[in-house]
Amino acid sequence: MLKRLLIAACTLLFAGSLLAATPAAKPHVLIATSLGEIEVELDPAKAPISVKNFLEYVDSGYYDGTLFHRVIPGFMVQTGGFSAGMQEKKTRAPIKNEADNGLLNERGTLAMARTGVVDSATSQFFINLTDNDFLNHGARDFGYAVFGKVVRGMGVVDQIAKVPTTRRNGFADVPSDDVVILSAKRL
């Protein structure tokens, strides 16, 4: 009897240590757009700051009603900073650039958009339409931090990439007809 209890206790301890060693689940977010749904998987193990930042914007409803404001076929589609009429949305403080995390700017990945200042990313992000090696860390500068990937709805992303664009309010590559994030929610 004592032997069985000892075996059961050891088994429980071993199972507990296995569970503790299991990496945290990768959060999924459903981005419902005016052209369809895009499901993304985030990588908090490799991009903890970017993922935390993105999820804070998602959870607050910040992305709801946000435009895809920069669409460049064969390159990327960008969103996260403007509402209807190209009105710039207020953001939180910039975050540290995690482009040195080993994740690459490959087709279907999400990366933080930024200015020429390395640590200037806030709410804007883009989805790569192709492998954009020149955006990777060290390719030409610090790079652009990848923090997730599209797991469903890449056809919607490709559809966004095909919309006609124009200049609007001093911005180039803006869709002629608004492409809008209707909602972004954790799954």
Curated annotation (Swiss-Prot):
One GO CC annotation: periplasmic space
Annotated Gene3D superfamilies: Cyclophilin-like
Reactions this protein catalyses: [protein]-peptidylproline (omega=180) = [protein]-peptidylproline (omega=0)
Domain PPIase cyclophilin-type: from-to ranges: 25-186
Record-linked Pfam families: Pro_isomerase (PF00160)
Alphabetized UniProt keyword annotations: Isomerase, Periplasm, Rotamase, Signal
GO molecular function: peptidyl-prolyl cis-trans isomerase activity
PROSITE patterns found in the cross-reference section: CSA_PPIASE_1, CSA_PPIASE_2
GO terms classed as biological process: protein folding
Location relative to the cell: Periplasm
Entries under CDD domains matching the protein: cyclophilin_EcCYP_like (cd01920)
EC number: 5.2.1.8
Record's signal peptide: 1-20
Primary role: PPIases accelerate the folding of proteins. It catalyzes the cis-trans isomerization of proline imidic peptide bonds in oligopeptides. This protein is not essential for growth. Presumably plays a role in signal transduction.
Family named by the database record: Belongs to the cyclophilin-type PPIase family.
Protein name: Peptidyl-prolyl cis-trans isomerase A
Organism: Pseudomonas aeruginosa (strain ATCC 15692 / DSM 22644 / CIP 104116 / JCM 14847 / LMG 12228 / 1C / PRS 101 / PAO1)
